[in-house]
A protein has these predicted regions:
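N-terminal cap/lid segment of alpha/beta-hydrolase-fold proteins
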Residues: 1-13
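Conserved HGGG/HGGXW glycine-rich cap/lid loop of the alpha/beta-hydrolase fold
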Residues: 12-64
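Conserved alpha/beta-hydrolase "nucleophile elbow" surrounding the catalytic nucleophile
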Residues: 32, 95-100
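Active-site loop/oxyanion-hole signature of alpha/beta-hydrolase fold enzymes
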Residues: 39-46, 54-94, 227
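Flexible "cap/lid" loop of the alpha/beta hydrolase fold
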Residues: 101-109, 115-143
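The alpha/beta-hydrolase serine catalytic core
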Residues: 127, 132-174
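Conserved serine/cysteine hydrolase catalytic core
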Residues: 158-201, 206-209, 217-218, 222
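Catalytic active-site module of serine/aspartate enzymes centered on a nucleophile-bearing elbow/loop
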Residues: 205-241
């Protein structure tokens, strides 16, 4: 059974969910989306097949809500604080939606510690939302519960306000990491043009579309993405699943 653990980043208490067990030489560190909390994934953690942790950056779930530190580089350092709490060695990074930007931000500063990367329905960029979109998102629901119950409202607004448009495409391509990318059938957050760019810049990547999934690629099958990640990280380790 997964357990809640905490670590510290510059005085900010960060929560993460930890499956425990054998990390097989490199645990999975999963950085989910803006409206996710770690508990969303408790049921599927065993299916990853090795020790897996789910990060809650500041302002999310059970993590602290400081007055500042909501810029991209600081949120990336939250990811790094959890990584360091779990291991001093390499990890397999898994991301979903907006968590992708913060995970990649950390990876680009610590490339020798990243054994593979799997991205769920996003592109390697920090993106800006159009005016009005953040509040509409935060006033809505995600996976059946109000978003305001998942993320601190003021912290989320600060996160969107501190965001800066940043591209990681070229830097990430230079790392030549084993890469898995899954996009949803909505083709909104990963357009056909961006999908083609993935093919050009990452010719060895595994690119898969879940044509029956909305942006929440854990629907309708909660374990489909997890199984792909499991096979991906095992292959990156040079061992069978």
């Amino acid at each position: 059974m997964a357990v809640s653990r905490f670590t510290d980043n510059g005085g900010v208490r960060l929560h993460f969910l930890d499956s425990g067990g054998d990390d097989r030489g490199a645990p999975i560190v999963f950085v989910p989306g803006m409206t996710c909390v770690a508990e969303d994934y408790a049921e599927v953690l065993p299916a990853f097949g090795r020790r897996t942790v789910v990060v809650e950056i500041r302002g999310h779930g059970r993590s602290g809500v400081p007055a500042d530190g909501y810029d991209g580089p600081t949120l990336s350092s939250d990811v790094g604080a959890v990584v360091d709490a779990v291991t001093s060695g390499p990890v397999h990074l898994v991301t979903f939606s907006r968590g992708t930007a913060y995970a990649i931000g950390w990876a680009l500063r610590h490339p020798t510690r990243v054994r593979s990367l799997a991205i769920g329905d996003y592109i390697p960029e920090e993106r800006l939302l159009p005016p009005g979109a953040p509040r509409r998102l935060l006033d809505g629901r995600w996976r059946g519960t109000p978003v305001r119950d998942r993320v601190d409202y003021d912290a989320a607004i600060k996160t969107f306000e501190r965001a800066r448009a940043r591209s990681f495409w070229n830097e990430l391509a230079r790392l030549r990491l084993p890469l898995l990318v899954v996009r949803s059938g909505e083709r909104v957050l990963v357009t056909d043009e961006q999908w083609s760019r993935y093919r050009r810049e990452f010719p060895d990547a595994t690119l898969i579309e879940f044509s029956d999934s909305p942006h929440d690629i854990f629907r309708p099958d909660r374990r489909r993405f997890v199984q792909l990640v499991r096979d991906h990280v095992d292959h990156a380790d040079g061992r069978p699943s």
